[in-house]
Curated annotation (Swiss-Prot):
Protein name: MYG1 protein C27H6.8
A Pfam family this chain is assigned to: MYG1_exonuc
Domain of life of the native organism: Eukaryota
GO cellular component, one term: cytoplasm
Protein family: Belongs to the MYG1 family.
Length: 340
């Protein structure tokens, strides 16, 4: 007897295509065929049903969200702290997402990595699918422009158009599954192969910050191209060290064979508003003029806003950061004004 994953026939949407893709990644469902029907008797033959049937019951493997009274979110299911009403994609992700991520990455992935990916992928990939399928707008008021490039819109384009025959609907659904699945798998692998290694580098730099300076307010990373801002703020919250007031980050600039001294922004969304900009007397200076003013050899530049500067050597960059801390602490009123 054929094992079946059931979903509805007719026009399909991103949520059930994605739900079916996720289920097919799991050992217990990978050999199941997909039955698209609205016939209740046929659906009863299915081992698991998504986006049809009017029932959400994890114990019975039924994952619909259209029934009256359904209001579940990741928070109500005690999975994550998100309040967007779930679609069939979110329901399947809530219960099987960690296992799906592990399978895509080949298994034996650490639980800490899976937990981070599970949260991040819901926030950046799955939640919008839930919201769009449930008619939840991303903003209040009239949109300023139209966008049809989201995953839900692009997945919907696999449906037959009004002037095309509909005799290949199941094949088109498979194509939609493949499309959304490739997008999701790419996102998972990016996290594992690019995002996670960067996070490990930044976390190690944060943990070793007292080796750079006794204040613990300077962190240094050897990998100049490593993205740091998002990871830094996440790690700061996770380690509960926001009160430590980490102020500067130093990193190598392989392009110019020098080092950078960058002021930590006030939050991850800011670029020019910083906890402590580099000293006002240094700003806009370059080369010998900067070295003379700062008293530190090897000066390269300091941006006119004070958010970043440079030195020819690692030691020079550390010296700039240390002196900037001293000057900033000596001028608390001026520092507060610059932070506004």
């Amino acid at each position: 007897m054929t094992s079946l994953i059931g979903t509805h026939s007719g026009k399909f949407h991103c949520d059930e295509a994605f739900a079916c893709f996720m289920l097919k990644q799991l050992p217990q469902f990978k050999d199941h065929s997909i039955l698209r029907t609205r016939d209740a008797a046929q659906l009863e033959k299915c081992d698991i049903i998504v986006d049809v049937g009017g029932i959400f019951d994890h114990s019975k493997q039924r994952y619909d969200h259209h029934q009256r009274g359904f209001t579940d979110t990741m928070r109500t299911l005690e999975k994550l702290n998100f309040d967007t009403k779930l679609s069939s994609a979110g329901l399947v992700y809530a219960h099987y997402g960690r296992e799906v991520i592990n399978q895509i990455l080949g298994g034996n992935v650490s639980s800490s990595m899976i937990d981070l990916f599970y949260h991040r992928l819901y926030e950046q990939f799955v939640e919008s699918i839930d919201a769009i399928d449930n008619g939840i707008s991303q903003y209040d008021g009239v949109p300023r422009y139209h966008s049809s490039g989201n995953l839900s819109s692009r997945t919907g384009q696999f449906n037959s158009h009004w002037n095309e025959p509909e005799n290949d609907a199941d094949e088109r659904f498979q194509q939609a599954m493949q499309f959304i699945g490739e997008e999701f798998s790419r996102s998972v692998k990016y996290l594992a192969n690019v995002w996670w290694p960067a996070r490990e580098i930044i976390e190690a730099a944060v943990d070793k910050r007292f080796e750079i300076d006794a204040s613990g307010r300077i962190i240094l990373i050897e990998n100049g191209g490593c993205p740091w801002k998002e990871h830094f703020f996440d790690i700061e919250v996770e380690k509960n060290i926001a009160d430590d007031n980490i102020t500067y980050i130093l990193f190598s600039d392989s392009t110019n064979a020098s080092w950078r001294v960058q002021a930590i922004p006030v939050d991850k969304m800011s670029s020019f508003e910083n906890r402590m900009p580099l000293p006002a007397a240094w700003r806009g200076l370059r080369d010998d003029d900067l070295s003379k003013e700062s008293g530190i050899p090897g000066g390269v530049f300091v941006h006119i806003s004070g958010f970043i500067g440079g030195n020819l050597t690692r030691e020079g960059a550390i010296a700039m950061a240390r002196k900037a801390l001293e000057i900033g602490e000596e001028n608390p009123v001026k520092k507060a004004k610059l932070g506004n």
